[in-house]
């Protein structure tokens, strides 16, 4: 059965696409058809508008990712296609320029956002959105930022912000966009005024469905959410709502997602109880048997840890198993990929198996003897069913029977360990 929220979101996306298509059909033919390629019908990244910003009265649009060959007269001529332009301003940069277009009426500006966002100008998709002063948006430079990955292509700043606004101190949300394609890079950042809210958001939102995908949440690397402030023609500082490129976040150093990148071998473990130690986490993942563990770290004050495996498939299996296993200290842990790949050439140094968990009244030697005794008991019962007419040839060769082996365990000795192991493998 389809998720009602997902169904409702899909209906909204379809309605938005229909509105955009109608706007395109109504608009006048554009200038320079050889320079400006037809648009791609994609959801408009409406963004998380700042408090105090009223788009119903806005007549100005921001234009980002402009090709360096574009001139200011050409920019104004193109945007005149949606309505009369009052003024325009182009700010040149080395890699790509940006600018602002001021219309006489809001309808022309809204139509420009609907019809021109994503259009390719000299082979480069431009981004068009409402323009507003930076002062209207809260300064989040000192806030606590989290990384949100595996975002669906249709998720915008506004969608992301709405999903995390259930946490009272959520202050901002931004989806990162690829300047070359004009599409979402599949991840973004959410800011919080309160550190505890940020941690709670990581714990509670990791693995939750947002649109058509399960998102993953983690702490963001310092400086990963920085964006470039822009200056408008009247000197007011303005920032683009959907800022984002491969240079905006350290998480984008590798173009591939962790799921498809063999260099990612570390598992992020969230929602840990305060009393969980490094040894506890090691025991938990060792018991899963997903693979060879090479490193275990725990940040007890922040409630998360990391488990590094020898290979990528082992880490992937650990994530899958960790999210479906019983609780650890009465909490359901949440596993996802770590945000950094294992550096190439890292030496393999497997950790030794962790010491068994203490049981009241029993020593480690007692537990080891008990495990051996249990294995022999199972071996004897299976052997009795399979070889009722005679002894197993290996048992005959070594002179062992079930009762004798069990007695040897109680006497504290076990001279035929190798023989018993052979019996366990060959029965």
Curated annotation (Swiss-Prot):
It is found in: Nucleus. Keywords: mRNA processing, Nucleus, Phosphoprotein, Repeat, RNA-binding. It comes from the Eukaryota. The modification Phosphoserine is found at residue 246. GO terms for cellular component: cytoplasm; nucleus. GO terms for biological process: cellular response to hypoxia; mRNA processing; stress granule assembly. Residues 1-23, 223-261 are annotated as: Disordered. Residues 59-133, 144-222, 265-340 form the RRM domain. It holds the Pfam family RRM_1. One of its GO terms (molecular function) is mRNA binding. Residues 9-23 have a biased composition (Low complexity). Heterogeneous nuclear ribonucleoprotein (hnRNP)-like protein that acts as a component of the pre-mRNA processing machinery. Functions at multiple steps to facilitate the nuclear maturation of plant pre-mRNAs. Interacts with UBA1A and UBA2A. This is Oligouridylate-binding protein 1C.
């Amino acid at each position: 059965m389809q998720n009602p929220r997902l169904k409702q979101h899909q209906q909204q996306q379809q309605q938005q696409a229909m509105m955009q298509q109608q706007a395109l059909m109504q608009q006048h033919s554009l200038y320079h058809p050889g320079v400006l390629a037809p648009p791609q019908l994609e959801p408009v990244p409406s963004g998380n508008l700042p408090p105090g910003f009223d788009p119903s009265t806005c007549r100005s649009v921001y234009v980002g990712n402009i090709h360096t060959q574009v001139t200011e007269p050409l920019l104004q001529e193109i945007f005149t296609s949606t309505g009369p332009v009052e003024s325009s301003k182009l700010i040149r940069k080395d890699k790509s320029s940006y600018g602002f277009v001021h219309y006489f009426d809001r309808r022309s500006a809204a139509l420009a956002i609907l019809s021109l966002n994503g259009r390719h100008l000299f082979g480069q998709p431009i981004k068009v959105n409402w323009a507003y002063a930076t002062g209207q948006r809260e300064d989040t430079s000192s806030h606590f930022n989290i990384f949100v990955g595996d975002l669906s292509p249709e998720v915008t700043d506004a969608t992301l912000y709405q999903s995390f606004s259930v946490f009272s101190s959520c202050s901002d949300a931004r989806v990162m966009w690829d300047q070359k394609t004009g599409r979402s890079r599949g991840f973004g950042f959410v800011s919080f005024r309160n550190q505890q809210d940020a941690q709670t958001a990581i714990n509670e939102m990791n693995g939750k469905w947002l649109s058509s995908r399960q998102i993953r949440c983690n702490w963001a690397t310092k400086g990963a959410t920085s964006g470039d402030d822009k200056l408008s023609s009247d000197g007011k500082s303005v920032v683009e709502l959907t800022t984002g490129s491969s240079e905006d976040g350290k998480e984008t150093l590798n173009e591939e997602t962790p799921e498809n990148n063999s260099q990612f071998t570390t598992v992020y473990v969230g929602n840990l109880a305060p009393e969980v130690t490094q040894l506890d986490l090691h025991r938990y993942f060792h018991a899963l048997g997903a693979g060879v563990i090479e490193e275990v770290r725990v940040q007890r004050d922040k409630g998360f840890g990391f488990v590094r495996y020898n290979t990528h498939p082992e880490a992937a299996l650990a994530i899958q198993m960790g999210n479906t296993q019983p609780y650890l200290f009465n909490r359901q842990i949440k596993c996802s990929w770590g945000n950094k790949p294992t550096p190439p050439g890292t030496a393999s140094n497997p950790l030794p198996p962790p010491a068994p968990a203490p049981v009241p009244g029993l020593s480690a030697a007692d537990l080891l003897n008990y495990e051996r005794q249990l294995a022999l008991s199972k071996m004897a019962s299976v052997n009795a069913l399979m070889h009722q007419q005679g002894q197993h040839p290996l048992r005959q060769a070594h002179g062992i029977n079930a009762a004798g082996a069990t007695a040897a365990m109680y006497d504290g000795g076990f001279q035929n360990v190798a023989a018993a192991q052979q019996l366990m493998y060959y029965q």
